[in-house]
């Protein structure tokens, strides 16, 4: 006869059910464990990016090296893109997914660090503080909200394609006004993605997909930061 004492371990059938469903429908302790993993990984990613950027800003030799070799930004960006593709293919392969996660974060951190060397340190600090405040506020709002944000996905991805196209056209028709408008729209777009991805990690992902959840939020943070940085510089030029 099965033991119904709550002190006994749960059955494997219950575990299979919880891990086969989305996070929101899993048991409380699985939800909390998932969130701890996601935000612990995310915190380490942001920490690595912050430290790397600070080193590039502090040491003049690194700044000079980047300014003399701006193609490094493209190399790091392409490396990040390739690693994202590999992570998508091996998202459930442990511990390979964690090794790929570290490599991706390092590559992305180097790309961001290279970019910020072209900006004033004061503007970088402002953008960092604004990004942190916005992310924490939107995360708190989304996690306690009862609204279904998945319906905004199509609009957000359409907006992303439009933003990419506008960014390409900007290469040929650059103006400070266009830079300001695109930076503003980009920042608003990635605020939307933070809400969408925070909602999705609870309602669309399974508990074992914490690596993908962390990467999605990390990319939202990086893109929000970079667009805020562009916005602040554009405003500063006016």
Swiss-Prot record:
The gene is Tmbim4. Anti-apoptotic protein which can inhibit apoptosis induced by intrinsic and extrinsic apoptotic stimuli. Can modulate both capacitative Ca2+ entry and inositol 1,4,5-trisphosphate (IP3)-mediated Ca2+ release. It is a multi-pass membrane protein. InterPro entries: Bax_inhibitor_1-related. Residues 1-38, 90-97, 142-151, 197-208, 230-238 are cytoplasmic. The keyword Transmembrane applies. This is Protein lifeguard 4. The lineage of its organism: Eukaryota, Metazoa, Chordata, Craniata, Vertebrata. GO terms for cellular component: endoplasmic reticulum membrane; Golgi membrane; Golgi stack. It comes from the Eukaryota. The keyword Transmembrane applies. Belongs to the BI1 family. LFG subfamily. Residues 209-229 dip into the membrane without crossing it. It comes from Mus musculus (Mouse). Keywords: Apoptosis, Golgi apparatus, Membrane, Transmembrane, Transmembrane helix.
